[in-house]
């Protein structure tokens, strides 16, 4: 509940009184705060001194004291008045801006006196004012002027006139302060200032400050009427501080001031009345001695000049000084005349003074500090009074008046600006309630002051009689004084805060009385409002407490309601929910009374406080009531739902029993109806209607039962309910079948079934028409643009919609026909013609007609069913075909766009070619050309794809859009031009490089040594005569044996090394055999002396970081290897570099393209260098991981492919899963916890490092050779203090194998590798492998395990074989992942222009013919069976469902189906080409014989030796050149035929391998797959001994596959048992001529070779068919 906001503050209107003095003072007011405490102390000291003089004077008799001295105050008081504490600048709070209240001030005409009814006009002059002692006034003035504030603010101003003492009430003082801002405020009561000075002195003593001197204040009072408060002189200064501060703090200060006045009321009453009588009588007596005319005129003029107009400020100050002098003289005269007054007058005056000072002290609290003590700066006469009160209180009054007049003339009163006065007035009048009635037009502030004084006047009722005695004297004084004008009164009232000041001669009595009334009324209103606010606060607090309580309770109940959940379906849960609902509802009902109380509080606030804003209360109450209503309605609805659920559950059992009884009764009726159906057909109709009626009951019971079955928690109840439901369903279905059968029998008349037959025939015709329409829609070519395809899809949707509309009718007729023929006996399905031919329908019996009808219906049902199914299938196929065309067309257009951008980029690169100026630039441009070739290789693949897509569209009668065809044709042309341009560019660069090399006299090779440690050695010195090292255009080294005149890709040392590795083939187990071979290679290449950290640093130093997908050529590889080998001492650097390059090219670049991937280069070196095994695993994973340190399937496949190439080079790849890396990737992903569905779905999945390491710790089959290599290296120097039980070797060096079944049986590694056995030991026994010396703990452990194994039977070991590695099944797996070629993502270079490459291509097959080195069962040189299958899988086009072959059988079948026609076409082309060549050769021979018969013998001789034609003529030379070309062409043809024969042999070998795999039993899968031995996690060449002690080995579980034999032509292995001795021969021109005759002889056998190839292909087809079966 909030109170209404106060009205806004109206802007202050500036009048004429904004003179020159106002703007100077207003900004300086905030800066005088530091002087306020000092001013308060001065004022307090003055009052204390005055009080001391009064107390001293009170002890004497009244006639004894001097005239003009103030009457003494009572020596003691019953209760001390609290002092006003002095505040400093830091304690003062800035007064808030108080909005003004509307008030009216009635202005009076300027210059006219205000006439008060009942009072005589003011015509007399007031008595003269008593003069203060000069010393007192001067000391006060000096004290005030000594302040820096006083000197700053009141410089160059006249001194104020002498202050006139008067007895003013609190209302008069406040009114006078507000009406005259030029006057200084009066001093506070002495008791208050005494307390203030005491407090200030105590604080000063605490702070170490000197006490402030306290001047003695003096105040003169004038007599007034009885019941009226005297009005202060206009010379009195304005204001005190606490008026605004009290308003700022609110009603609290006012109540405190009123409480203090109530406490002092009893003491003040008598003293105040006596003081008023004596003081006012003396004023009246003194007034009679004053002269009338001039003084009254001057006083009236002064009163008229007291307006707030700043233009008349100077005249007003002059009049003020004169008036003060006159009044001081009059007061002095009156005091002299009244010297004989009684002592009671002194007591009355003292009482009145105490009361007035107390009121002033109360009102001073309500003003700010800036105004509370501002009067003391300008009231210089206070110093004189203080001096008089402290030292000589008996000084003459005349001197005091004279001194005060003198000091007052030095400094005039401070003028204030109109803005500042208006601000003070607004702040003083702000908090007065506007309801106060202003009878005389006074401001609200005056009414408040009058109300307060009225309350004080009631306490002085006892002094009313004494005050009446002095009324006459006061009336005479009032009659003698001049009246003020109405304009002056209006101006004074406008700037007043607490009370209105009138002159002494105005009718102030009536105004004061009204002020008292207004003050009482305002005080009463304020007190009422305060009480109302207290009550409002109390009610609001109760309301808020109740609201918070209810909101908390509602929130808890709402949460409880949300947790109730849905309605259950079981009895026990429903019962619990009902209890919960009832308790919830009961709690809602119990708390209803709290909401009633809350609503009562709300209504009370609204009714009791109608003038305040209660909108927020109403809204909060409505929200809470609405929440309660929602809760109540929700719980009632839930109760109804629970009741309905319970009722439904209870009625389910009854309904189930009733329905089962109905079924029993109906089944009995059906049995009876079957016999009596013909006599009483109406009985079946009633039965049928009853069954249809109970169909709804059955559906409801079945649905309810299923719901209950799903919600039951008890197993027994669920089983029982399931049985009842099954029984009900079965009996209902049987009843329906019986009903249908009876209905069919009733409807078995000819008309019904004839109508069914007719309907079936009509539907058949409709289906045939729709089939024809579908053929029309799908007939003809399909438009390949997107719009046409979308239109055809829309047509298909419309067509399918027609089929769906007809489907219910077709299925209904088919169902009826099948039911009819099912109930009839089986008859022959002869046609209608045959049936009519047998007999005429007119002579048929009813039984024969029924059989004929049945036969027709059966035939039509079968025909309609077949036609309908075919139509649906054709529609589905059309839809699938359109979707496929749409997808392929979009892909085709996308590839065209990509290809176009690639070709444009290549053409732009071509335009920037410049001729080379040096060898270095030629090499750099050659590298750029090579990169461009790589890019164009990808573009060529895309172009081939586009051409294949276009061929597919053409074959399927899909019209490709003309723009796409045009673009494809343009791209083909541009690609051919680019290829020609690149070939020409390569020739230019090669010629430039060769020319520069010849000029330099170099060996044909230039390298860049930047970034290496020292210059590169001359690698030509790596071989010794008769060998010579040469390089191709791609910097690929090859070696020439001048003794045998042959060339080799392998270094002579590498050939010897490979021959030496053949001796290790005697090792029985493939994992150890591979590890031994790799260890030999590692030592020969000195890679075991290069640490992995050195290799990684070298990679980074040469810029190979994050370049794994790029290519590295041989010069760069040489540079990196040189930086590694220079760190090793005592090696043949040139030989090591050549061997390392040779090994890496054999592993990763068998085609000798001269470039490999950076990833392959790094993997090949890291696998064989020295390092910790786990560190190698981590580094290998980092090579393929992305920025998030994760590797997907493709990256993992690339890594495993590069790793598997190492055993592949050694001919051991078949023992480790083959070249197919998909099973290993799948095994890794499954080990990482990825589901099989995610792997098969080709989702975007990846693994982290910990997954990869966890998989490798299980030692997978494809990488098991790597940890075995590390253990083998660690065991080379190990010596075991044991004796071999077979060869008796002691100590055992290397591996030590301890049998875990035979006690104290050890074997050395040699015996174990060769599979030797002892008498009692067998290969099936488990063994433990040690590569370091054993400990006693291990001995005890092995003995315990051996003891356990003694008690295990042979069946246990067969049932629990210990493979020792993680097997990977690869027989039934396809190559769905990327198995990159030797350079993935880059096609090998075509070195057609390289002489050595061409010679190698020709001679590789011719050498086989010459030496007969290859057998019929040899395998390919560069591919094993897995890689060949993988290549064919990638070459096969995708099937319609997008599934790739998963087994070798499927691969072979798909390969045969796709490649058969291609092979036959190649064979036919070769036969045709061979026939043409033979015909051309015969024609040439005939021409030569006819033209030169005498040289026929020479021609025959030339066929054997081309050197014999050197002396022939020009025509003979031409003929010889053509013959040479013909022979070369025949050689190429023969080589291609040989390749085809080799291809057929490859297929036969693969089929043989597949037959072996298919014939193997499932239990032998472990032996069919490869084998190896896993290592402990973290084993390495330099690992600690304790990491290599935990290997268990079973010899019978190890793979014993024989290794492939190496083909020495290119360093690869083949499965032929006999090594081939055929080498790559350099065929010169003379040698080609020498074998010409052999080629002529072999040309006649081309037809035979073709027949052999065809026969082999037929055999392959037959074998594939057998495998498929």
From Swiss-Prot:
Oligomeric and partner information: Component of the dystrophin associated protein complex (DAPC). Interacts with Dg, via the Dg WW domain binding sites.
A Pfam match: Spectrin
Domain WW: start-end pairs: 1021-1054
Superkingdom field: Eukaryota
GO cellular component terms listed in the entry, alphabetical order: cell cortex; cell junction; cell projection; cortical actin cytoskeleton; cytoplasm; cytoskeleton; dystrophin-associated glycoprotein complex; neuromuscular junction
Topology relative to the membrane: Peripheral membrane protein
Keyword terms of this UniProt record: Actin-binding, Calcium, Cell membrane, Cytoplasm, Cytoskeleton, Membrane, Metal-binding, Phosphoprotein, Repeat, Zinc, Zinc-finger
Organism: Drosophila melanogaster
Secretion signal, residue range per the UniProt entry: none
Entries under PANTHER family matching the protein: DYSTROPHIN-1, E3 UBIQUITIN-PROTEIN LIGASE KCMF1
Disruption phenotype: Flies that have reduced expression of all isoforms (transgenic RNA interference targeting the common C-terminal region) exhibit severe muscle degeneration in larvae and adult flies. Muscles were either ruptured, absent or the fibers were detached from their attachment sites at tendon cells. These are necrotic, not apoptotic processes.
Zinc finger (ZZ-type): 1279-1335
Name of the protein described by the UniProt record: Dystrophin, isoform B
Spectrin repeats: 541-643, 650-747, 754-883, 890-990
InterPro entries in the record: EF-hand-dom_pair, EF-hand_dom_typ1, EF-hand_dom_typ2, KCMF1/Dystrophin, Spectrin/alpha-actinin, Spectrin_repeat, WW_dom, WW_dom_sf
Example of a GO biological process term: neuromuscular synaptic transmission
Job of this protein: Required for the maintenance of appropriate synaptic retrograde communication and the stabilization of muscle cell architecture or physiology. May play a role in anchoring the cytoskeleton to the plasma membrane.
GO molecular function: actin filament binding; structural constituent of muscle; WW domain binding; zinc ion binding
Binding residues for Zn(2+) 1: 1284, 1287, 1308, 1311
Bias (Acidic residues) ranges: 1630-1641
Biased composition (Basic and acidic residues): 153-166, 485-500
């Amino acid at each position: 509940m909030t109170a209404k906001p106060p009205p806004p503050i109206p802007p202050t209107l500036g009048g004429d009184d904004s003179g020159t003095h106002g703007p100077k003072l207003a900004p300086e007011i905030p800066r005088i705060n530091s002087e306020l405490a000092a001013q308060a102390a001065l004022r307090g000291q003055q009052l204390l001194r005055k009080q001391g003089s009064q107390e001293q004077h009170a002890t004497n008799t009244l006639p004894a004291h001097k005239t003009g001295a103030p009457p003494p105050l009572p020596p003691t008081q019953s209760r001390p008045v609290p002092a006003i504490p002095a505040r400093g600048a830091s304690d003062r709070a800035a007064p808030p801006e108080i909005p003004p209240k509307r008030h009216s001030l009635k202005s009076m005409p300027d210059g006219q006196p205000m006439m008060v009814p009942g009072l005589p006009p003011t015509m007399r002059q007031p008595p003269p004012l008593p003069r203060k002692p000069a010393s007192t006034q001067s000391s006060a003035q000096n004290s005030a002027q000594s302040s820096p504030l006083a000197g700053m603010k009141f410089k160059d101003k006249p001194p104020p006139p002498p202050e006139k003492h008067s007895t003013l009430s609190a209302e008069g003082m406040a009114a006078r302060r507000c009406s005259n801002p030029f006057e200084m405020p009066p001093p506070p009561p002495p008791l208050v200032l005494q307390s203030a000075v005491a407090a200030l002195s105590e604080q000063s003593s605490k702070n170490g400050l000197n006490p402030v001197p306290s001047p003695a204040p003096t105040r003169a009072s004038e007599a007034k009427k009885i019941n009226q408060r005297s009005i202060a002189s206009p010379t009195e200064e304005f204001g005190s501080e606490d008026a605004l501060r009290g308003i700022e703090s609110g009603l609290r200060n006012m109540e405190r001031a009123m409480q203090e006045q109530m406490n002092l009321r009893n003491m003040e009453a008598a003293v105040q009345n006596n003081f008023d009588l004596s003081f006012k009588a003396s004023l009246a007596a003194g007034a009679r001695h004053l002269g009338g005319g001039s003084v009254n005129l001057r006083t009236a003029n002064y009163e008229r000049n007291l307006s707030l107009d700043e233009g008349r400020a100077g005249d007003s100050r002059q009049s003020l000084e004169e008036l003060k002098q006159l009044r001081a003289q009059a007061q002095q005269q009156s005091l002299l005349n009244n010297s004989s007054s009684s002592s009671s007058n002194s007591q009355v005056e003292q009482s009145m003074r105490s009361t007035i000072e107390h009121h002033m002290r109360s009102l001073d609290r309500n003003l700010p500090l800036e105004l509370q003590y501002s009067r003391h700066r300008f009231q210089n006469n206070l110093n004189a009074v203080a001096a008089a009160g402290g030292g000589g209180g008996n000084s003459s009054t005349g001197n005091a008046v004279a001194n005060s007049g003198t000091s007052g003339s030095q400094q005039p009163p401070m003028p204030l600006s109109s803005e500042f006065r208006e601000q003070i007035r607004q702040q003083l009048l702000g908090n007065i309630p506007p309801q106060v009635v202003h009878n005389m037009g006074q401001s609200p502030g005056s009414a408040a002051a009058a109300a307060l004084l009225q309350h004080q006047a009631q306490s002085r009722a006892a002094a009313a009689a004494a005050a009446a005695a002095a009324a006459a004297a006061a009336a005479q004084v009032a009659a003698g004084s001049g009246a003020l004008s109405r304009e002056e009164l209006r101006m004074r009232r406008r700037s007043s805060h607490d009370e209105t000041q009138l002159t002494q001669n105005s009718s102030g009595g009536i105004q004061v009385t009204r002020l008292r009334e207004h003050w009482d009324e305002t005080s009463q209103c304020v007190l009422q409002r305060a009480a109302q606010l207290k009550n409002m606060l109390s009610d609001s607090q109760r309301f808020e407490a109740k609201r918070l309580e209810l909101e908390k309770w509602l929130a808890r109940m709402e949460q409880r309601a949300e947790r109730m959940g849905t309605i259950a379906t079981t009895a026990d849960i429903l019962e619990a929910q009902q209890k919960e609902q009832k308790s919830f509802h009961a709690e809602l009902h119990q708390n209803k009374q709290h909401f009633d109380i809350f609503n009562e509080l709300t209504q009370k606030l609204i009714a009791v406080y109608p003038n305040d804003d209660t909108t927020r209360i109403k809204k909060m109450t409505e929200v809470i009531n609405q929440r309660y209503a929602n809760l109540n309605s929700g719980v009632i609805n839930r109760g109804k739902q629970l009741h309905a659920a319970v009722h439904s559950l209870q009625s389910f059992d009854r309904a189930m029993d009733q329905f089962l009884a109905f079924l029993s009764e109906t089944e009995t009726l059906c049995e009876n109806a079957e016999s009596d159906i013909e006599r009483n057909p109406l009985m079946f109709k009633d039965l049928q209607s009853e069954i249809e009626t109970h169909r709804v009951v059955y559906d409801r019971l079945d649905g309810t039962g299923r719901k209950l079955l799903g919600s039951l928690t008890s197993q027994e109840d669920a089983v029982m309910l399931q049985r009842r439901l099954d029984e009900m369903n079965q009996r209902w279905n049987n009843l329906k079948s019986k009903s249908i059968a009876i209905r069919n029998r009733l409807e078995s008349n000819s008309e019904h079934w004839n109508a069914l037959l007719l309907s079936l025939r009509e539907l058949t015709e409709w289906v045939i028409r729709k089939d024809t329409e579908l053929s029309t829609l799908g007939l003809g070519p399909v438009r390949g643009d997107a719009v046409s395809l979308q239109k055809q899809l829309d047509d298909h949707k419309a067509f399918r919609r027609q089929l769906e509309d007809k489907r219910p009718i077709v299925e209904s007729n088919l169902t009826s026909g099948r039911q009819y023929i099912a109930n009839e006996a089986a008859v022959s399905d002869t046609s209608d013609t045959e049936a009519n031919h047998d007999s005429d329908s007119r002579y048929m019996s009813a039984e024969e007609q029924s059989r004929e009808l049945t036969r027709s219906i059966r035939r039509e049902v079968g025909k309609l069913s077949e036609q309908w199914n075919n139509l649906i299938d054709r529609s589905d196929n059309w839809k699938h075909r359109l979707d496929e065309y749409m997808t392929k067309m979009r892909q085709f257009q996308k590839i065209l766009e990509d290809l176009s951008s690639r070709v444009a980029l290549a053409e732009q690169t071509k335009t920037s070619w410049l001729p080379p100026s040096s060898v270095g630039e030629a090499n750099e441009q050659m590298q750029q050309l090579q990169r461009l070739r790589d890019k164009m290789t990808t573009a060529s693949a895309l172009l081939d794809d586009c051409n294949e897509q276009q061929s597919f569209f053409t074959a399927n009668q899909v019209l490709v859009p003309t723009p796409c065809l045009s673009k494809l044709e343009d791209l083909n042309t541009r690609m051919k031009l680019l290829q020609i341009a690149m070939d020409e560019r390569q020739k230019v660069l090669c010629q430039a490089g060769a020319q520069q090399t010849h000029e330099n006299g170099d060996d044909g090779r230039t390298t860049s040594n930047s970034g290496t440690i020292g210059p590169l050695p001359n690698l030509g010195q790596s071989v010794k005569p008769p060998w010579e090292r040469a390089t191709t255009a791609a910097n690929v080294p090859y070696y020439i044996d001048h003794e045998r005149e042959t060339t080799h890709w392998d270094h002579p040392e590498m050939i010897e090394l490979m021959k030496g590795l053949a001796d290790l083939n005697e090792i029985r187990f493939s994992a150890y055999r591979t590890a031994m071979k790799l260890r030999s290679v590692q030592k020969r290449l000195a890679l075991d002396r290069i640490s992995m950290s050195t290799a990684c640093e070298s990679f980074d130093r040469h810029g190979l970081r994050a370049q794994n997908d790029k290519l590295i050529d041989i010069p760069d590889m040489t540079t990196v290897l040189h930086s590694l080998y220079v760190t090793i001492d005592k090696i043949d650097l040139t030989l090591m570099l050549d061997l390392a390059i040779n090994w890496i090219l054999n592993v990763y670049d068998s085609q000798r393209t001269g470039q490999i991937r950076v990833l392959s280069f790094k993997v090949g070196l890291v696998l064989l260098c020295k390092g910790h095994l786990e560190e190698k695993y981590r580094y290998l994973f980092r090579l393929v991981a992305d920025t998030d340190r994760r590797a997907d399937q493709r990256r993992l496949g690339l890594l495993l492919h590069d790793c598997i190439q190492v055993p592949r080079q050694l001919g051991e790849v078949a023992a480790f899963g083959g070249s197919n890396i998909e099973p290993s990737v799948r095994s890794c992903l499954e080990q990482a916890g990825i589901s099989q569905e995610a792997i098969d779905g080709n989702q975007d999945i990846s693994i982290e490092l910990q997954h990869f390491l966890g998989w490798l710790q299980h030692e997978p089959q494809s990488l098991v050779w790597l940890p075995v290599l590390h253990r083998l290296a660690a065991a080379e120097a190990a010596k075991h203090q044991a004796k071999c039980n077979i060869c008796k070797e002691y100590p055992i060096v290397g591996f030590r194998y301890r049998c875990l079944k035979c006690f104290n049986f050890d074997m050395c590694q040699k015996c174990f590798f060769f599979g030797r056995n002892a008498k009692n030991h067998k290969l099936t026994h488990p063994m433990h492998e040690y590569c370091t010396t054993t400990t006693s703990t291990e001995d005890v452990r092995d003995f315990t395990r051996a003891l356990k194994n003694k008690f295990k039977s042979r069946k246990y070991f067969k049932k629990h074989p210990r493979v020792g590695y993680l097997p990977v099944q690869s027989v039934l797996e396809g190559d769905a992942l990327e198995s990159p070629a030797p350079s993935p993502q880059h096609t090998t270079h075509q070195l057609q222009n390289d002489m050595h490459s061409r010679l190698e291509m020709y001679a590789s097959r011719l050498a086989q013919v010459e030496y007969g080195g290859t057998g019929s069962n040899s395998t390919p040189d560069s591919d094993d069976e897995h890689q060949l299958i993988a290549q064919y899988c990638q070459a096969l086009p995708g099937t319609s469902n997008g599934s790739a072959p998963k087994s070798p059988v499927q691969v072979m079948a798909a390969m045969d189906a796709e490649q058969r026609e291609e092979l036959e076409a190649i064979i036919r082309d070769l036969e045709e080409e061979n026939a043409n060549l033979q015909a051309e050769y015969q024609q040439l021979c005939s021409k030569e014989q006819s033209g030169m018969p005498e040289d026929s013998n020479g021609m025959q001789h030339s066929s054997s030796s081309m050197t014999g034609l050197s002396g022939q003529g020009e025509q003979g030379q031409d003929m010889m050149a053509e013959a040479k070309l013909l022979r070369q062409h025949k050689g190429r043809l023969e080589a291609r035929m040989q390749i085809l024969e080799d291809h057929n042999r490859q297929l036969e070998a693969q089929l043989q391998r597949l037959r072996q795999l298919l014939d193997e039993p499932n239990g032998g899968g472990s032996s069919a797959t490869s084998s190896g031995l896993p290592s402990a996690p973290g084993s390495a060449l330099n690992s600690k001994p304790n990491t290599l002690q935990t290997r268990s080995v079973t010899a019978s579980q190890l793979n014993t596959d024989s290794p492939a034999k190496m083909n020495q032509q290119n360093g690869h292995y083949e499965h032929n048992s006999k090594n081939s001795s055929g080498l790559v021969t350099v065929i010169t021109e003379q040698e080609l001529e020498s074998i010409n005759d052999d080629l002529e002889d072999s040309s006649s056998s081309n037809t035979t070779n073709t027949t052999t190839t065809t026969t082999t292909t037929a055999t392959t087809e037959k074998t594939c068919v057998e495998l498929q079966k």
